[in-house]
C-alpha cells in the first residue's frame, strides 16, 4: 500500500511538472512562444468608443497554467487541461 501511494505521488508530480506552466506570453517573461497546432489566430473587431476600450482590455496577453487543485488568487478558470487520464484546471491571469 505504501508503495502504491509513493508511485501515485511520483506520477502526479511528473504530470504537474509537464503541465505547469503551459503557456507564458507576457512582456515581463522572456520565454519563447511554442509553435504548434494549438496556435490559433483570432481577429476581434468592435465599433465605437466603447468597442475600442473593450478591444484594449481583451487584447492584453494572459499567463495561463494547468493546475491540479484550482486557480490561485489573481487567476480565473478558463477551462480544463487533460494529460492522459488526468484532468487539470486551466487558470489564466
From Swiss-Prot:
Disulfide bond entries: 64-92, 66-81, 71-91
Signal peptide extent: 1-19
Subcellular location: Secreted
Keyword Magnesium (UniProt): no
An individual GO BP term: defense response to bacterium
Propeptide positions: 20-58
Database matches in InterPro entries: Alpha-defensin (IPR016327), Alpha-defensin_C (IPR006081), Alpha-defensin_N (IPR002366), Beta/alpha-defensin_C (IPR006080)
Family from the record: Belongs to the alpha-defensin family.
PANTHER family with a match to the protein in the record: ALPHA-DEFENSIN 1, ALPHA-DEFENSIN 1-RELATED
Annotated function: Probably contributes to the antimicrobial barrier function of the small bowel mucosa.
Protein name: Alpha-defensin 5
Lineage of the organism: Eukaryota, Metazoa, Chordata, Craniata, Vertebrata
Amino acid at each position: 500500500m505504501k508503495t502504491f501511494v509513493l508511485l501515485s505521488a511520483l506520477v502526479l508530480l511528473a504530470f504537474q511538472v509537464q503541465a505547469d506552466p503551459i503557456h507564458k506570453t507576457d512582456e515581463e517573461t522572456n520565454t519563447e512562444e511554442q509553435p504548434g497546432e494549438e496556435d490559433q489566430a483570432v481577429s476581434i473587431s468592435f465599433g465605437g468608443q466603447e468597442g475600442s476600450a473593450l478591444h484594449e482590455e481583451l487584447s492584453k496577453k494572459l499567463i495561463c497554467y494547468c493546475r491540479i487543485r484550482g486557480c490561485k488568487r489573481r487567476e480565473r478558470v478558463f477551462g480544463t487541461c487533460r494529460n492522459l487520464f488526468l484532468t487539470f484546471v486551466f487558470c489564466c491571469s
